[in-house]
């Protein structure tokens, strides 16, 4: 029963931190350490992220199906650029063993680095603009690859 309560707490942490420019994975790692949850690898994080994905799909299902032209998304460059931006993260995920970074010591430093990145990006936000093209989609994908690390925020990137 205690384990169930711990995982409910982790689910709440995931839900509260996913849509802010903080690392939900990093916070999950920290709270697993605080709650003394023995989790080998990233299984709890993966399950929590699938829960987030499921809730997002449910949330946006209504707006997608109420769209006047459902084919717009699939006939625009959006799907193409979304695929391009995913490629670097997939390659990094296949090449590197990220599970070694799911520990309290690494996360504390990556959360600190993430905070500095967010401050720097907020200062630079008006100095450049990206147009959606192959190069910018690939660049976005490279930054998202860095965000695979726990403690680095995907939305902060």
Please describe what each predicted stretch is.
Residues 1-157:
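Multi-pass membrane proteins that catalyze or facilitate reactions on polyprenyl-/lipid-phosphate substrates
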